[in-house]
Structure formats: C-alpha cells, structure tokens
C-alpha cells in the first residue's frame, strides 16, 4: 500500500504550494503582476449539485465511484486543498471532502464556547455524522490536520487574537487540559490506523497579515515572516505529532517547504505569487 500512499503525499505537497498561492482582493492584480489571481477563496470553488462542499453539515460531497476512498477531514485550510485534490485523485478513488470552518475531529472531548462556557451541540451532531463514515472505514486514506496549534493549545499567530471563540475541553470536567486533548487525538489516530492509512498534515504557516489589505505592493519586497515566530506558535504541536507513531501513519510537513532554519525566514511570496494570505 506504500506504493499508493507516497504518490498521494507528493500530491499533497504540491497542492499545499499551489493552493496557498491565493489572491482574493479585486483590483490587486492590476497593481501587482500576479498570475494566480482568483476572485474568491479556494475553498469556495469545490461544489456539487450547485452547493459548495465547504461548510456542509450534512449531505457531504462525494466524487468518484471507486471502492477505494480518500476522506479529507478538517477546516478551511483543508477546504483550500480539496479543490485540486479532487481533480488529481478522483479517477482512482472516491473523494469525500468533509471541511468545515474551524473543524477539528476529536471523539472524547467537548467543544465549548469561551463566551458562554456552553457545549456546542452542533459540533457533537456533526462529529456523530462523521463518525458513521470513518468508524466503518477500511483500507481508506484519511487525511487529518488544519490549524492544529489553535485547537490543541489555543495558540495562533504571535501578537494577534485567536479569532476563534471556542475551546476543546475534557468531556467530564469541561475544563481545558492539553493532556486530555492530546490523548483524545492520539487514540483517534491509533483507532483509525488499525484499518486505514492516515496522513497527518503538520502546521502550515499563518502570517497574520493580509498583504493585500495592507497594500504592501511597495513593501512586499522587504516583508519578512520569521521561522522563530512560526515555531513559537507551533513547536508544541510539532513535538506532539512527532511522538505519535503507527505503521500506517504518514506525515506531511508543509512548513519545511516554506521555512528555512538557517535564515530564520519563511517564504511568503515570490515575484509572481503569494503563497498564503490571512
């Protein structure tokens, strides 16, 4: 099965590069020469039956007729990968993108509102529906990840608010415990990897700045995103993921494509493309 998994991992690497090259502000392409201009976020383009796949809580999109399935499970970062991934795998697999704003799959934790401390029942309902799919999976490929530092440790871009009014907590105490959340996710990986191949996508850089809204067309040449800032946000989850082991667990490291330890910089753009926006 490795002969199948490794091409999928290669495709993911390529899609991470190209799908995070996104321009969304109308008119910006007239000021900066950008070949990959598009009028809306990538996750809005994948549709079925005249409805976007992103944000569906029921009737999840399903492309292809193969018995072999790829299930993409995550948030808007994964929603941006779904569009091209569908085209690249649908001839050999049934592709099921389950992508929701701020979604991270945990089985034994509760999601609460940090404003009201109330349990988010809609998350539980969505999770139950997803469990009916993945708990019966056998010899599928399940791709997991997203803004994992946020979901596991409440960390996001250095110096910026979270923009997420929720928190995963222990199901019994309804209190946050990083160990409880880690154990939940580790058990999920162990359970799913008994019968499936799991691709775990490590954190992607989040720069915390919209280079278009800030009108950086004159400053873009000198804009720097430091690798040390990325690590301050994500080192904890990287170390945690490094410690998860399974013979059917395969790992993808997007930050290694963009970040250079020696220069302490992560590339945000080249002469023609932005790699990501915020």
Question: Residues of each region from the PLM?
Answer:
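Extracellular/periplasmic envelope-modification machinery, especially enzymes
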Residues: 1-278
């Amino acid at each position: 099965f490795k002969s199948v998994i490794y091409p999928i991992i290669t495709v993911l690497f390529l899609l991470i590069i190209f799908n995070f090259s996104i321009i969304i502000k109308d008119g910006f392409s007239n000021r900066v020469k950008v070949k990959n201009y598009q009028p809306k976020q990538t996750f809005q383009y994948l549709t079925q039956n005249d409805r976007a796949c992103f944000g569906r809580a029921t009737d999840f999109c399903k492309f292809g007729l193969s018995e072999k399935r790829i299930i993409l499970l995550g948030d808007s970062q994964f929603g941006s990968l779904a569009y091209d991934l569908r085209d690249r795998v649908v001839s050999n697999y049934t592709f099921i993108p389950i992508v929701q704003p701020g979604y991270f799959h945990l089985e034994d934790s509760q999601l609460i509102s940090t404003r009201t401390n109330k349990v988010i029942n809609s998350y539980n309902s969505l999770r139950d529906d997803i469990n009916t799919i993945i708990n019966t999976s056998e010899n599928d490929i399940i791709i997991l990840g997203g803004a994992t530092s946020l979901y596991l440790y409440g960390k996001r871009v250095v110096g910026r608010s979270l923009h997420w009014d929720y928190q995963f907590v222990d199901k019994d105490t309804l209190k946050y415990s990083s160990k409880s959340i880690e154990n939940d996710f580790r058990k999920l990986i162990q359970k799913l990897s008994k019968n499936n191949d799991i691709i775990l996508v490590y954190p992607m850089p989040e720069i915390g700045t919209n280079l278009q809204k800030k009108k950086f067309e004159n400053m873009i040449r000198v804009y720097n995103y430091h690798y040390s800032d990325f690590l301050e946000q994500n080192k904890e989850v990287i170390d945690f993921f490094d410690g998860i082991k399974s013979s059917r667990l395969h790992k993808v490291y997007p930050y290694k494509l963009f970040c250079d330890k020696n220069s302490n910089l992560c590339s945000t753009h080249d002469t023609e493309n932005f790699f990501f926006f915020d």
